[in-house]
A protein has these predicted regions:
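Acidic, proline/glycine-enriched N-terminal capping motif
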Residues: 1-69, 76
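Glycine-rich, acidic
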Residues: 2-11, 104-252, 256, 325, ...
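Glycine-rich, small/acidic residue-mixed loop/short-helix segments
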Residues: 64-68, 72, 214, 219-226, ...
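Alpha-helical segment of the N-proximal tetratricopeptide repeat
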Residues: 332-366
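Structural signature of tandem alpha-helical TPR/SEL1-like repeats
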Residues: 349-361, 384-396, 418-432, 451-457
Length: 460
């Protein structure tokens, strides 16, 4: 199973930049009324009553045996309305209505298009359109675009930072064009690339990796979608008992597979004559240079990093168990550092500073506290005689971190180049004072540590 160059480029775009796609098959179910949260509290596995306006959570619905009916995310819009985001909306709607009697809550599937932006630069792209964005996973914000309401949900579908824009159909074309113009460098991501990204991120989907035959603790959803402190809901007793007394017999985890042949979906994994698991979604991961798969494994075979020679539907395979996710996204700080290193490498190889400067601006946008990126950008701007901009940059850094010695040192140098002797001397004095204060603090901390060690030695 080899990926085409086009598919791999789409994957790289999401991992390094930003990709977009419309979420066909997904929809928003609105629940509205003064009893909305109290009703959902009795039906769902997570603690709906803890949600504040603008917050969200992953959740699920189970039957009395804790078998999964569906999974979704819940988002509190205002005092009375919440949204349920699901790729199984009809089942979700039908179930809730079947338990809905006198409660003041009305359900409606909204006519909205769902546009996903995924990747480390998705936030930067959306910040050009919206004044603010939700900061926490499943957080939600309402905005206006061309006089019409839009809603933004923070949600990763690929393992990277990502957002979902919920927009009326009439805005679909104009909004998409605004987001994907040449300046944003955002690429449309096809279904095959999305599947690889999803499997690498270890994200199971209902109907493929889990269904009504699975009890919820088998799926891994108990880590994100279950509150063990809330009141009663359907299936709670079984879920709580499994947590208290042991682990499910089978549970979802990752396996890597040697060789070029992908295992069949739902293929039985046999170790000798014993069935120890079942294969679910699989994909070719170029970042790992391996075939990877989600699989339900029997509890005696769920230790990570264990290699096994097995047969899957009577074909021999060599597999290795691993914890999910296969891929761990970089933090904003880590991504900013990569961009800094990229800019410095380009600077070594070419004289033109425009490209490194653009990359460093991007690094600072992604992680505004990255002092080394500020320093490098200030140096490059000074080399282009853009001293006013370099000074403004260092002042911004002193506002972010008043204890940053390097910012005051550079300001002193830049002021001196402009002939602003008094300002230069003041910044030099500030840098010297900070350096002295930090040296004193370091010395005192060292003495305190030594004193504590001596005290512990006396007490022995």
């Amino acid at each position: 199973m080899q990926l085409t160059p086009e598919i791999q480029e789409e994957i790289n775009q999401v991992r390094q930049n930003c990709g977009y796609f419309f979420m066909e098959g997904w929809s928003i179910l609105s629940a509205n009324g003064k009893d909305t949260l109290s009703f959902l509290q009795t039906q769902t596995t997570n603690d709906a009553l803890q949600l504040q306006v603008g917050q969200g959570q992953s959740s699920a619905i189970t039957d009395r045996q804790a078998r999964l009916i569906t999974s979704f995310s819940l988002h509190r819009m205002d005092e009375n309305e919440s949204w349920l985001l699901s790729d199984n909306s009809k089942t979700l709607h039908d179930h809730l209505e079947s338990y809905h009697f006198r409660e003041d809550v009305a359900f409606e599937t909204l006519n909205l298009d769902l546009l996903a932006l995924q990747g480390p630069k998705s936030m930067l792209i959306l910040e050009k359109v919206f004044s603010s964005l939700p900061e926490k996973p499943n957080g939600i914000e309402r905005h206006d675009f061309e006089g019409a309401p839009l809603t933004v949900i923070k949600k990763s579908l690929t393992g990277e930072e990502g957002f979902i824009i919920c927009l009326p159909s009439e805005l679909k074309e104009n909004f998409t064009q605004k987001l994907v113009n040449a300046e944003t460098q955002s690429t449309k991501i096809g279904e095959q690339a999305r599947e690889v990204l999803r499997v690498e991120a270890g994200i199971p989907i209902f109907g493929k990796d889990m269904d009504g035959k699975n009890i919820l603790p088998e799926t891994g959803l108990e880590h994100s979608s279950v509150s063990y402190n809330k009141g009663c809901y359907i299936g709670q007793e079984v879920i709580a008992r499994i947590k208290t007394y042991g682990a499910p017999n089978f549970a979802l985890m990752g396996v890597t597979i040697e060789g070029p042949i992908s295992p069949p979906m739902n293929g039985s994994i046999l170790l000798g004559d014993k069935k120890i698991g079942i294969i679910k979604s699989s994909a070719r991961s170029e970042s790992l240079d391996k075939l990877i798969a989600l699989a339900y494994l029997q509890k005696d075979h769920r230790s990570p990093d264990v290699e096994m020679d097995v047969s899957i539907n009577e074909r021999p395979f060599k597999i290795k168990t691993c914890l999910l996710p296969f891929y761990q996204a970089s933090t904003r700080k880590e991504h900013s550092k990569k961009l800094l290193n990229e800019a410095l490498q380009i600077y070594k190889e070419q004289e033109n500073l425009d490209n490194p400067i653009a990359i460093l601006r991007e690094a600072i946008d992604i992680y505004p506290k990255h002092a080394e990126a500020y320093e490098a950008l200030g140096v490059f701007l000074a080399k282009q005689d853009k001293l006013d901009e370099a000074i403004a940059l260092m002042k911004r850094l002193t506002e972010i971190n008043p204890q940053e010695i390097m910012a005051h040192t550079n300001l002193s140098v830049y002021y001196m180049k402009q002939g602003r002797i008094e300002d230069a001397e003041n910044e030099k004095a500030e840098a010297t004072a900070l350096q002295f204060e930090q040296a004193v603090e370091k010395s005192m901390a060292k003495k305190m540590k030594k004193k504590e060690a001596e005290q512990r030695k006396k007490e022995m």
